[in-house]
Amino acid sequence: MLVDKPPGPSSFAIVADLRRRTGARTGHAGTLDPFASGLLLLLSGRATKLASCFVGLDKRYVTDIDLSARTSTGDPEGDVVERLEPPSEEELERRLARLRGEVELPIPAASAVKIGGERAYRLARRGIAVQMPTRRSRVEVLDVISYTGAAVRLDLSVSSGTYVRAIADALGGHCRTLRRTEIGPFTVDEADPNRVIPAEEALARL
């Protein structure tokens, strides 16, 4: 099932709602942060066993990044930790060029990655500073849609597991909005909470 998640609820809340409505075991092929919107690919019943076929698919996003400040979480929900002068268009393009292709990016502290057996975001909430590991990501597309004032809107296509918030931080800002538009061959325009895609049909598109 393809669902267009609105900003606000967690991905797990969307999964739980479908589980309540269907009474079937339900999972997902990649979460979205609560502040983010866009495409979730949900798996129900026996299809949950096929999660590995979908989790590793590339993702596409549109994001608005505020280049005047970094936040503690890389999104609008965190505290401002640094004020910055927005870069010129030429400097922005230089920063973008460094992030295209294969890159190593620090995993955000406000993430579900486990550090010493505990979720990183729980450590961050308690004010415990830890050295976050990096993750190798592949950035296929990183294009400017618009750049006005301190706000840049980007279209980006990245490998599974890439944190767009980490890209925003590397550019010298934080995500104000984030919308997932594609998961592999599936697009947000196809999202319909009332349509169940048969597993065979979904697999045939990969």
Predicted segments, located by residue:
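Catalytic/RNA-binding core of pseudouridine synthases
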Residues: 1-206
